């Protein structure tokens, strides 16, 4: 254990040394000396040296504008390098040699075997396993793609250095390469000059598939197969496809006017182009491998008599894939394709069938070892990615559909749909859905907004079934919200019943979700088209912003539980789609713990979950890390289904109901009820300046003129994370626990902590958040940026935070936060030395900018953006 972490510390030290050499070469020794002085003062300040703290503040307050940028960049880049070293640690040899993770697939299978779980149960559960990760563009993904590539290369160098048989010359060559990469990163602008377009975001998603997931999926399936054989003696079927990927990049138009129907069309084309490109690389490698001559009579009868029968089949696929690339090249360039559509590959079966025939023939001819190599990997990629690379979700806000239908009803003389009662809306929608005549008048010219909604539906109609995975309705509140989308799809010519998914986001909507779905299931037309399958999306971000973490997480749990029970009663196969993020305020928790804390039976039809921006990079950005992440997801789902968590006791539910009510009231009293809260929030955080950072394609606000309620959940959390108060992740939670303890419920709460995964995960995540907060830094923001008349609010919140920390420590019976996870506590302590100067510098920069808002200094603006990205790296999560 000690060796494992000393290796990581050595890597961090080495990378920091190389960064120092780079800075000295680029900026001169004086700047390096200044940076080193700030680092030492920050470290001593953290150790309680008040003199060092004052010297640190004075040094940062007097830095000249031209020196601010290199100083900010130095600390920001060091934190990025620390993240790389930590990410590498999870996949390093030392990690696997010293920590046989109890959360791994093999450890789970060993436990299942020891507990005598029948082989048939394990086989059935493995064959039903489904993990669908939905890649989404992240408004606060702060690392540019050009830097991500360099970070991947640094990771590879760390891996090479771990080999013990390196010669001095080999070691020096790797270290020289590391120095080159760190220098390249230093001389690359870490801040984008302009926001990415949705098309560029989609390219980023496809790059993750190409550089990591393409390799990781077959590798993960080999691990799963090895464990299945070792412990239970069964092989995974070749056609088993437990992993799927979907994407929102190019499909999510909720609040993003830049995602148009044409963008969606082009992203779908680009996905097919990239899939053809990746499969072509595989096919060319297979052509080299499959030089063998022996095949079965059936294979020969189907494909003809050839000296190298498999190569002949593979070469035919190579020609078709080359033609496919040319076809989509032309479409992407808005040219008429030179290749006919019948000459290209448009369906998975065109790849699967000939390659599976090769596989079966090789198996039958005694060449299992060859069949189970690259050919098996390729077959598994066809099952996972297919010729569309990933499926695409479409998402739009519920009012956009209602407004479109209201326009239609007004035009055809039926009145204003928007003013009708819910029962009248449902009656109209069901009547139109059951009718064979079209609803849309031929000569009607809709508004631009409605035209865009209809154009999107028409793009869906152009796609074969399965390319678009579902249509998600954000801010869904009623059954008519779901029926309205079905009607718009029907009227736009979609020839199949696309799954339409309500997204329940606010506290009230989560509580009403069972009633809404029950209404839908009681409609004959609806039951007739859903084929006894239903997906429902649970929103984590907006419910936490609406009600606070504790109330939101309990509402999410209860909604899932109610929906599972309802669907069981109605014989409907329910898939719960979790819209969670990386931060606690957005439902984030370590994947394994988060899944085991779900209600019993909620994962029996698999998992569908969003993976966003920076979390995609941390969890899926490297092949070995992605294999590890997929393993954690798989083991948690299998464990939840084979060794289900306990049903909550009635007493636990009562306590949670009370905690939820109290915490929601406390949270809303501050966020909604405190008259000075919005001006305090805007002054104490860089919320207003964040909008200038070219992070994602989506605007930060639904309504540019609105207050906190109009701010999207992600920037809301991002802003509070910057000033180290991290308010959305804890406000109300600790205070509600304290009140319950004061009422004599401590014994029950301790029992919940020990034996209920849902509750212990919540408390564990609270402890993690508390360990990243800093009351002194938060106070520093207030004193230099906030009107003294509003200081009382910050003082009150910090006092509450201190009390909440003591409350959580009283439950864990520890003196220090994260005592049970000393490695995380050490990681946070290490980062603080580098994050503190960025926070202090950020305050100074905000002060300078706000003093002269009409004529901002470009160097100061640039440095502020760097501190924002640096603090995000230091906190190891953004929004």
From Swiss-Prot:
PROSITE patterns: PEPCASE_1 (PS00781), PEPCASE_2 (PS00393). The keyword Zinc-finger does not apply. Pfam families: PEPcase (PF00311). Its EC number is 4.1.1.31. It comes from the Bacteria. Coiled coil: none annotated. GO terms for cellular component: cytosol. InterPro entries: PEP_COase (IPR021135), PEP_COase_bac/pln-type (IPR022805), PEP_COase_Lys_AS (IPR018129), PEPCASE_His_AS (IPR033129), Pyrv/PenolPyrv_kinase-like_dom (IPR015813). Keywords: Carbon dioxide fixation, Lyase, Magnesium. It catalyses: oxaloacetate + phosphate = phosphoenolpyruvate + hydrogencarbonate. GO terms for molecular function: magnesium ion binding; phosphoenolpyruvate carboxylase activity. One of its GO terms (biological process) is tricarboxylic acid cycle. Its cofactor is Mg(2+). The active site is at 138, 545. Gene3D superfamilies: Phosphoenolpyruvate/pyruvate domain. The keyword Ion transport does not apply. PANTHER family: PHOSPHOENOLPYRUVATE CARBOXYLASE (PTHR30523:SF6). Forms oxaloacetate, a four-carbon dicarboxylic acid source for the tricarboxylic acid cycle. Belongs to the PEPCase type 1 family. This is Phosphoenolpyruvate carboxylase. It comes from Pasteurella multocida (strain Pm70). The gene is ppc.
